[in-house]
């Protein structure tokens, strides 16, 4: 077996970043929930 997590900053931002979240309704709901909860970091 090999390590399945090979971190890449660009890929992480593209998949889970703020702009990607804002594109879809469900993504905006994620941001909204995290704001309500008082998360320090909203996205990756």
UniProtKB/Swiss-Prot annotation:
Any single Gene Ontology cellular-component annotation: ribosome
Sample GO molecular function, one term: structural constituent of ribosome
Region (Disordered): 1-20
InterPro entries xrefs: Ribosomal_bL34 (IPR000271)
Positions with biased composition (Basic residues): 7-20
Record-linked Pfam families: Ribosomal_L34 (PF00468)
Keywords: Ribonucleoprotein, Ribosomal protein
GO biological process entries: translation
Family: Belongs to the bacterial ribosomal protein bL34 family.
UniProt protein name: Large ribosomal subunit protein bL34
Organism name: Clostridium kluyveri (strain ATCC 8527 / DSM 555 / NBRC 12016 / NCIMB 10680 / K1)
Highest classification ranks of the organism: Bacteria, Bacillati, Bacillota, Clostridia, Eubacteriales
């Amino acid at each position: 077996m090999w390590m399945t997590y090979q971190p890449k900053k660009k890929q992480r931002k593209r998949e889970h970043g703020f702009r990607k979240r804002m594109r879809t309704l469900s993504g905006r709901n994620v941001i909204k929930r995290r704001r309500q909860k008082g998360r320090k970091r909203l996205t990756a």
